């Protein structure tokens, strides 16, 4: 089986594929100081809890936007799986031209999302990823990565409110607000985040559409995608597994033929 690993600034998402089918996924916190053996213990425990074995893994592909973590993860793969993983980065075949001033600056996760979106929709698409940062990426109808937008993520904004104010509490769980007019502090912050980010998303998508001048499919992914999409009429689809699917596609384009 293929183990796909998406290492983000806040969380690391793992997906186990049997051919093209995602059979299980896990989400763990990204920790810069985690050792090789700590990764081994954690991932073996996750596998054991769901009836999988380290020996089941025949290949690994990794997308990582946290360079200090990558070396430990590579060594973990060699020690516990006896596998040299494929790392998404320069020199990897994505099948997608990247039109960016410096293509090396584009986060691996953004390219992986773009590859998955074009492979699935085959049309001009905007991918909105609600991660540590909220990103908007435009893929042309020819399957070209054309650039995008980076804005502060939802949790970054919440942490800023908590650390930069004296009386506002930390809020980590969000729900669809019953009303924009809230009656207590927590509800007020919840409404501000949900409706504020829905407005941000609609505003950026509208500006991108006006500038691009073509009809676009909009797909959202990331931890809070479904919640924000419920308040944003411009998002067409939500795919929680878009990044993992993109990693599988890129693996197929780079695996060695027997």
From Swiss-Prot:
**Catalytic residues, chain numbering:** 109
Q: What cofactor(s) does the depicted protein rely on? A: NH4(+); K(+)
Per UniProt, subcellular location reads as: Cytoplasm
One GO MF term on file is: metal ion binding
Task: Provide the catalytic activity annotation.
Answer: (R)-pantothenate + ATP = (R)-4'-phosphopantothenate + ADP + H(+)
Q: Record keywords: Transferase included? A: yes
Please provide one cellular component term from the Gene Ontology annotations of this protein: cytoplasm
> What Pfam families does UniProt report for this protein, alphabetically?
Pan_kinase
Keywords of the record: ATP-binding, Coenzyme A biosynthesis, Cytoplasm, Kinase, Metal-binding, Nucleotide-binding, Potassium, Transferase
Q: How is the cofactor bound?
A: A monovalent cation. Ammonium or potassium.
SUPFAM superfamilies registered for this protein in UniProt: Actin-like ATPase domain
Q: Quote the record's binding site residues for ATP.
A: 6-13, 132
Q: Does the keyword Transmembrane apply?
A: no
Name the InterPro entries on file.
ATPase_NBD, Type_III_PanK
| EC number assigned by the record | 2.7.1.33
Q: Which residues bind substrate?
A: 100, 107-110, 185
Q: Which Gene3D superfamilies match?
A: 3.30.420.40
Part of which pathway?
Cofactor biosynthesis; coenzyme A biosynthesis; CoA from (R)-pantothenate: step 1/5
So what does this one do? Catalyzes the phosphorylation of pantothenate (Pan), the first step in CoA biosynthesis.
Quaternary structure per UniProt? Homodimer.
Protein name listed in UniProt = Type III pantothenate kinase
Query: Source species, please?
Result: Syntrophobacter fumaroxidans (strain DSM 10017 / MPOB)
